[in-house]
């Protein structure tokens, strides 16, 4: 794993969480780089960090937030709004998220599969550059977790954690 792989690490966890939610009837899209949304409302977030010693990962940390029964801010949604009450217990979803982390550990060995599955779950097909306001078509996700963009003959990529790119979000 390279330093620029922190973004792919986060997407791997987001994908595993999305799969876990889907297995319980909740369809969540991946809002690059680190959120899960239902419609346009945020259900969960992922904060990845890889700690390196030289070129080797020494420690992988992941922060996971999932709205289950809690009050949510405007623009958010909780599982209690999506599932019957008996299926919205915090301890139950703690277990489901631990299972998602185990699944992410398995997925990490297959970055091409992660990218393909994450691309199918992307929240939109075009984005506006926050700095310029220009609209870009989303072409996919790079093996380092970058969001790949095209505007006519121009291409760029956005990265959120580590690595190098033409543009940043």
Question: What are these regions, as identified by a protein language model?
Answer:
Residues 1-169:
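Catalytic beta-strand/loop module used to bind and position nucleotide/cofactor moieties
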């Amino acid at each position: 794993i390279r330093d620029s792989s922190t973004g792919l690490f986060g997407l791997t966890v987001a994908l595993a969480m999305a799969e876990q939610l889907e297995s319980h009837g909740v369809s969540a899209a991946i809002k690059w780089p680190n959120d899960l949304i239902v419609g346009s409302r945020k259900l969960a977030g992922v904060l990845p960090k890889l700690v390196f010693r030289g070129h080797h990962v020494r420690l992988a940390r992941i922060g996971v937030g999932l709205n289950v029964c809690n009050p949510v801010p405007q623009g958010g949604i909780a599982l209690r709004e999506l599932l019957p009450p008996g299926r919205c217990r915090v301890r139950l979803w703690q277990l489901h998220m631990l299972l998602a982390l185990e699944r992410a550990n398995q997925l990490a060995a297959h970055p091409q599969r992660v990218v393909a599955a994450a691309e199918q779950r992307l929240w939109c097909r075009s984005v506006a550059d926050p700095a310029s306001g220009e609209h870009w078509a989303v072409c996919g996700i790079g093996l380092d977790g970058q969001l790949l963009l095209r505007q006519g003959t121009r291409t760029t990529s956005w990265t959120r954690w580590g690595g190098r790119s033409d543009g940043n979000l």
